[in-house]
Amino acid sequence: MLTDKVAIVTGASSGIGRAAALLFAREGAAVVANARGEAELQKLVSEIEAAGGRAVAVAGDVADEGTHRALLEAALGRFGGLDIALNNAGTVGPYKPLGEVMLEEWQHALAMNLTSAFLGARLQIPAMLERGGGSIVFTSTFVGTSVGIPGMGTYGASKAGIMGLVKGITADYGARGIRANALLPGGTDTPMAGDAAQKEWAAGLHALKRIAQPEEIARAALFLASPMASFVAGSALYADGGNAAVK
């Protein structure tokens, strides 16, 4: 499905990002994988290469523009271009009412969840235009878009801003072949999901009464990244186990 494509995947050392990097590689893409931890990234690259795929690791913080430049340089220098970006890395928290959130906490959430997405897209777009277009997928969330959750207003606001970015990119570059879309997972069994009690609570938010496995969300990302979604642009794909239906 992604034969001869080149994909950047951020937040690739665990959870949704790792599952997506493995899936994209199995589908034929060369993967430029990013996370802050070098050791886990190298394990991912080794797993992809052992299965016959192509991948390279670029460690770094997505809140740093230099990380995005290094990712793009790896895509161009190692694999010759860029076709797909899954801007997936982010953070959760702080878990507190908005009236108690410190400015530094607010700024950190925006830097990790929204500004990082802008920094990536700003560099990815010109590279994709050189190839006649591409697909940019941003991982957002149902929190702040379909539902507000007490104590998660900062997280929800920082992720809800992704939709403005998606629509802006679509308006500016859709006619030139770039598709931008947001993927909105429900609760997913990742290291950020918390302990068993937190996962059980999250499961109760969804019509399916369970949380997702990372591979389930990765398949939704694959759809948006692939030619199967060739007429999907400026949209939000809820992979939320029916949360939006029962909120």
Model-inferred region functions:
Residues 27-44:
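Conserved glycine-rich Rossmann-like NAD(P)H-binding loop of the short-chain dehydrogenase/reductase
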Residues 121, 158, 166:
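Active-site helix of classical SDR
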Residues 96-98, 105-110, 202:
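Substrate-binding pocket helix/loop in short-chain dehydrogenase/reductase
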Residues 126, 145, 167, 171-172, ...:
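Alpha-helical segment proximal to the catalytic Tyr-Lys
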Residues 3, 92-95, 222, 233-247:
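Short C-terminal tail/terminal secondary-structure segment
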Residues 174, 179, 232-234:
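Short, small/polar-rich loop/turn modules that mediate ligand/substrate recognition or access, typified
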Residues 6, 13-15:
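Conserved glycine-rich cofactor-binding loop
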